[in-house]
Amino acid sequence: PLGIDPRSCDTGNVIIIAGELKMVSQTVRHQGARLIIASTRRLAADQLDSRIKSLNYLNQIMARIEANEAGADEAVVLNQAGFVAEGTADNIFIVKGGILLTPPVTDCALDGITRNIILDIADKLSIPAEEKSITPFDVFTADECFLTGTGAELIPVREVVGRHIRQA
């Protein structure tokens, strides 16, 4: 019914959606992004494993709408337990007390390519790094914060919900 029964698919289909790719502005790259904490939550891992790229971006779209309406550049999406999961299309890192922190995949963070590169570089440079559950308060009180993504690369964060991030 409704075309969602996989047994009714005799052959595979390829769908390509092409549109203008809008990258992060140079202003945001130089001045830093302004973030909000979205009220829209990330689906729980037992509902939709964050490692599955299913193109089901409804929660991220809803969070992005919240960011747009708030005049922010991006939204931080929390998981069902209230821990930081990720941005709408990027991973989040904070630096606190000299330690680089990012949410673990078990907190519904995307196991992103750029995220893993950052963790590998930190390891090679002997920079203390941990995958650890992060609260919104941890982000508010971070010494530094940045976002990563394949298209976004690395984006500094200057404020979260109007609170300025201290720069080390």
Task: For every predicted segment, state its role.
Residues L2-A168:
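Helix-start/capping segments and mature chain N-termini
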